[in-house]
Amino acid sequence: MKNVIAFLSCCMAAVLVAQDREPAVVPPRQPAPTIRSVSPRADERPVAIASYAVEARVAGAFASVRTSITVSNPNERPLEGALEFPLPDGASVCGYALDVNGVMTDGVVVKKEKARVAFEEEVKKGVDPGLVEHVQGNAYRTRVYPIPANGARQIRVDYVTPLAFAPNGDAALVLAMPRVPLKERSVSITVPIGGGIPQPVLGGLGDRRFAQAEAVWRSVTVDTDVTPDADVTVALPAMPERVCAVERVNDETWFAISDRPPSLETAKTSLPKTWRILWDASGSRTEADVKAARAVIDLLPDEACYELVVFRNAVEKPRICATRGELAAALDNTPRDGGTDFAALAAFAKGNPTENRTLLFTDGMDVLGEGDVDFGANKPIAVMTGATKDGAALRRLCGGRVIDLALQTARQALEEIGAPSPTLAGVRGDGIANVQGIGQLARGRVTVLGRLTGDNAEVRLDYGNGRLSKPATIRRTDAREGRTLATAWAASRVNELSPRADDNAEELLAIGRRYGITSPATSMIVFERLDQWLTHDVEPPESAKELHEKWTASRPSEAQRRQAEEQRRQKYLANLKREWEARVKWWNDPIPPKPKPPKSGLFDGLRRLTGSPERRSSVAMEAATGSARNVERRDMERSASYSARVDRFSRAEEPPAGDEVAGSAAGSSAQERRAKEPAKPKSAAATVTLTAWDPQTPYLQAIKDAVKALGGGANANAANIAEVAYAEYLVQRKKYAASPAFYLDCAGYFFGIKAKALAVRVISNLAELRLDDPGMLRTCAWRLREAGEYDAALAILRKVAKLRPEEPHSFRDLAITLDERGRRDASAADVAEAMANYHKAAFTAWKRENALWTAIVSIEELNALIAWSGRQKWPEGNQPKAPEMDAAYRKLLDLDVRIALAWDTDNTDVDLHVLEPDGEEAYYQHKLTSTGGFMTHDITTGYGPEEYLKKDAPKGVYKVLANYFGSRQQTLLGPATVTATVFTNWGRADERRQILSMRLEKVKDKVPIGDVTVK
């Protein structure tokens, strides 16, 4: 038989054509790693990939790939580069190295949370280590800093990947090439000879071919000054029915068997007449994704009934399509917008069971769900598309029935839909253990991995119903030296465990450490100096022999580490108690003996908040619907103005005993002044007016113009306005899809016109924009909370708590949202969980700088919730139980006025300023006012909260503003998004609150929040 191999040098596909069989598809181009500058100046050139080297070694049905990348910085100052790279489905990172002082230093596997915390602590010191971590699905990322001025930095990423198999059993390996000018590009590929594997065919490198060298086929290519226009492909056509590989590493022998299942004798199942189509219409879906999915839809029966269920952040009402044409038309008119929530989809599927054949078209990237979900008994067949995807999660969700359109044509996919393949039932044989691959679909080619425990083993694959493969003999004496198969086994096990990473964290960590695998539970980190390895108690790689010896000699004993940790914990708790006692002392006697009248000057010349009605938003205190000030987000660098107050950042985290609050909150003169004030009822009569903000961006103006064109009368009803506004939003989205500000601004507009469902959909795009970005997720959740969308906000905040468990703010945010939902719904479960999270934020001995002040705020809020709960009439036995704590902390500090300001960016300083009715200003340099106003600790390191407290508020207008002072964050992604919550009669039965979210565009930006009027 003569085969003709043709590789198409394009970015999408390479096709293997055979004369007597259907073409076998080699997967589309896998995106190559990309590097981008972080916080560049407008006049700077971006960092770039200068050289790119790939070494690949095929072993059986797998390949190990080492990619070495040199990134260059053509600018006059050091820059940071962010490297992002999706891998093939089923691949795992198994090695990472960074050049340190010109020497490549291997990364070591560390628990993911520990690695990230260590990395971020070093970032704050201005000396970045190297970190590579699994994001979600096949997405990985790393950061490179510093890339020296007019210099370069080298990183290395190793991964192991299964070969891509076409339905006819042919195999291929695709090595992604960046489409950028390279000073040097080198490619080295090795394929073993034997086992019936034919001579491989090389593509993407012109007329270069493999050459035989000893027991392998080898190709080595080095090009200079080249711009790749195609990926490098290695095709293994006409693969034998069975391919076996055996490797030896240390004292273990690992094997892989790749087998073509026996042909099914059963007749093809006819396609049904009724279908359920689950269509992922989230914002991350691309035109290419839809085109590939539509190719399958177009092959479904025309005369059939289709139930179309569109899902994003929420599931839409099902639509019935009487023909395939109606279905296609409906899909053509379905916008791609919003986040993805598989939990919502699974809830729909369970609540609306069907016997109809169900197809799920998606990439599997669940950005809003809270974890593992289950479709119940009738699991769908997933049709997967997308460059970034989560095949492992989909296989678990769908019982293994996943069709990857990167590996199959639409017609081949239809055959699988019409006659679903059986699964591999088992593997038979003595002398083998730890077999991976059981349960996979038996189509095209089936691959299993395992460990050989004896000298020899005869292995047969069981396809069920008495169908067994021919025996494959595995011999220890045939083993080559190598780690590919052992690492591939570990990667396969990790992929199996990853969809339930929280439940399998210990095993994932053990596998990661033993086999060097990055997973949802593990990352790889590289430090530059010995003290960093010691500080974070991370063992250096054995390959750095001298460093490892110094670390071993210098490392404190386990007893010493435990003692130091206990001393740190006790010191933290002692400081917490001292500061809480100072807070209570202020509350008992809030008037200072010696008032200080300095002013910041920020209120001078500021437009009065009683200005034009377009700039005002006065709403009932019951609601949390303040309009957001949204300014387009863009990358920013440290401002020169920041250095003028750098001393504020350099202060020690722990305050000295007897600081301003503790030392000046009492005195007879304070009592005398308070006695002269007019009597006022316990609960103040107050109103709050928040300052609405119109960002006046071109996209919002276009939306408003479209709505204005409706005119008046019947056309201007709420439904028509929302429909026209959303249509124009979709037009603008094509231009601004990458801008977080766009979604925040537009969501604010839709909230403003009472189109809440559309607003929630729009804001949920933030979760799709940057996977697992806690700042972006916090912003999204805060805006949802502001709108009263607690369920959606809580799902995101639970994810943030998993991403940032070392930050008290994660648990305080969760507690606040549970608190508010619990009060609204009179939910004992929510109230109890809120109390538990307040308690965690308050009494954990956090290591984070300024965590102490978040803890104090959490104690205030915990006591307020306990008091509220005590006033409710709960069903007998259902009253939420308050967590146990020292009696010294059980004190309700109720207030006439409380204002809390929090923000979403770390290492960033935002200040709260309040101008009291008598003209005295409370701010970080004047914390205690003569009438008893109290500004809490100045948080300069990010997140807040900062508070203004007023126990007994004199009558008058209190003006509030936020000032964006500066940031020392090296990689500031954009302006700070702040949320202000204004309370009156806080902690009392008639407590009222109002929330406003806004974004501060640039350093020194001062923004009016609003007025509090006490009557």
What are these regions (language model features)?
Residues 333, 362-417, 475:
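VWA/integrin I-like adhesion module and closely mimicked acidic/polar interface patches used
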Residues 268, 308-332, 367-373, 391-394:
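Short beta-strand-loop
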Residues 741-745, 775-779, 809-813, 852-854:
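Alpha-solenoid helical repeat scaffolds
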Residues 269-324, 345-346, 350-362:
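Von Willebrand factor
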Residues 868-1015:
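Intrinsic-disorder/low-complexity signal
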Residues 95-139, 143-148, 154-278, 382, ...:
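An acidic, Ser/Thr-enriched
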Residues 18-60:
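N-terminal, polar/Ser/Thr-rich
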